Amino acid sequence: MTKTLYYRKLGRTSAHRQALLRNLVTSLVKHESIQTTWAKAKEAQRFAEKLITMAKRANPQNNRKGLAEGMVFEKETTLKKVFDVLVPRYNGRRCGYTRLLKLPPRSTDNAPMGVLEFVDGPKDIRFHMTAKTVGICLAQQKALTPITRKNIHKVLLFRKNGKAEFDQLVQKEKESEHARLKEDHEDEKTVKKDWKRGDPIPRPTYI
């Protein structure tokens, strides 16, 4: 009879696995974004979600804060940030405090890699990439795709003061794209070419 595997063992003993996850979550709280293998990131994501949920439900009548202390290292600094920064940030969210994105495989052993981050934070990749996409589309006078509009709604739904920060990033990317387009246009004018964009590629004479 096959056994159901409810979690990844990560090739370690129980104590070593627990210490690894505590270390990953501590680094995640400290830096708000970490890169590791996909399997470790998936397990650390579950650990981090439990930590935030436990911190949100902590009160003097229960032992949730004591349980949260056992999930991280450097308790004084880590838990201070959890309760002072992360819990107020996610008061409006019931779940989904982290996001896991795929990265190219590691060059040395081709291991699947990923980046684990807290959403609505200063290192939110989707927030910055969506703002960059909108800025480029506005500079090139292109319509926003349905996926981009959906991402705008997602990244601004729970983010405090997100609209002002998003508009600032969009304007910055728009100006950067305008400068790039202007530079490309100047290069096309200065370089002498006996062909123009859209002309068919000439075939070699020996064919």
From Swiss-Prot:
| GO CC term, one of those recorded | mitochondrial large ribosomal subunit
Q: How does it assemble?
A: Component of the mitochondrial large ribosomal subunit (mt-LSU). Mature yeast 74S mitochondrial ribosomes consist of a small (37S) and a large (54S) subunit. The 37S small subunit contains a 15S ribosomal RNA (15S mt-rRNA) and at least 32 different proteins. The 54S large subunit contains a 21S rRNA (21S mt-rRNA) and at least 45 different proteins.
The UniProt entry's GO biological process terms, in alphabetical order, are: mitochondrial translation
| Keywords from the UniProt entry | Mitochondrion, Ribonucleoprotein, Ribosomal protein
Protein name, entry field: Large ribosomal subunit protein bL17m
Q: What function does the entry list?
A: Component of the mitochondrial ribosome (mitoribosome), a dedicated translation machinery responsible for the synthesis of mitochondrial genome-encoded proteins, including at least some of the essential transmembrane subunits of the mitochondrial respiratory chain. The mitoribosomes are attached to the mitochondrial inner membrane and translation products are cotranslationally integrated into the membrane.
> Where is the segment annotated Disordered?
173-207
Q: Which family does it belong to?
A: Belongs to the bacterial ribosomal protein bL17 family.
Give the organism the record lists: Schizosaccharomyces pombe (strain 972 / ATCC 24843) (Fission yeast)
Any GO molecular function: structural constituent of ribosome
Basic and acidic residues bias: where?
Answer: 173-200
Against Pfam families, the record matches this protein to: Ribosomal_L17 (PF01196)
Judging by the UniProt lineage, the source's domain of life is Eukaryota
Query: Is the keyword Ribosomal protein assigned to this protein?
Result: yes
Location(s), subcellular: Mitochondrion
